[in-house]
Amino acid sequence: MAYTYGRIILGLLLVLILSGCLYPDSERSENKQPNEQQLAIVQNAIEEFREQNNGLLPIKTKENDTPIFQKYLVDFTALKEANALSEIPPNAYEGGGYYQYTLITPEDNPRVKLIDLRNTESIRSVNVQLNGYRNEHIYPPYGREIAEGVYTLDYESLGYDAMPTVVSPFSGENLPIVMDVEGQLYIDYRIDLKNALDKYEHNYSKGDDIRWLLAENTPFVPAYSLPYTIQDGEPAFLLEEANE
């Protein structure tokens, strides 16, 4: 009898392990990685919803001046209510994951992409330090000017031992956090953009916004970025469109 109970308990444990129930949602591997299958499922759901609703998209309402790559966030509640999606992807923020699902080119060819919310949290953390500094000082803690109106951070004034960075969702490289003249924080994607210019075929020229090279060719968008263009074969800040 004891042997039988032991086998039953062992079987239940195996079921729990295989189903992932022994692990918190935040620790399950599908929450931590971009998943092409999950992207495809959401893409199909978007298209089904669009067909059902005369071209309308299931997106959350944002202010008009919201940066382009953070503007068209997928509304999973709307997708589920329309029966276009049975469950929220486990790697989505709404499902306990690290990513926010967003759309690019929604007007003519809506495509599903990801924002890595760990970078969002990194920006928010530095902003807390920055706001504390600005409560006591007139000007933001400018470091070195790397382009007209774009600065590194005087990180020591913010209480950091080293320059704050984020981990790139594109390359895994550490990307610097930079600041404009108003004290707005951005991620500097020049490392990733240089890699993309070398890797992907393109016809971009000076004055074009080359961030789309990343958005078009990877599962991610370059969130929290200033616009960039190409100059002498290298990525450069596209300063005249800094509000995009």
PLM feature segments, named:
Residues 22-25:
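Bacterial signal peptide processing site
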Residues 35-38, 72-75, 122, 126:
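Stable alpha-helical elements in mature extracytoplasmic
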Residues 30, 34, 38, 64-71:
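Extracytoplasmic/periplasmic, Sec-exported soluble proteins
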Residues 16-20:
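C-terminal motif of bacterial Sec signal peptides marking the signal peptidase cleavage site
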Residues 121-141, 163:
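Pan-zinc metallopeptidase signature
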Residues 59-120, 144-244:
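Extracellular/periplasmic head regions of type IV pilus-like filament subunits
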Residues 1-9:
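Bacterial N-terminal signal peptides that target proteins for export
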Residues 38-56:
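N-terminal alpha-helical signal peptides/signal-anchor transmembrane segments
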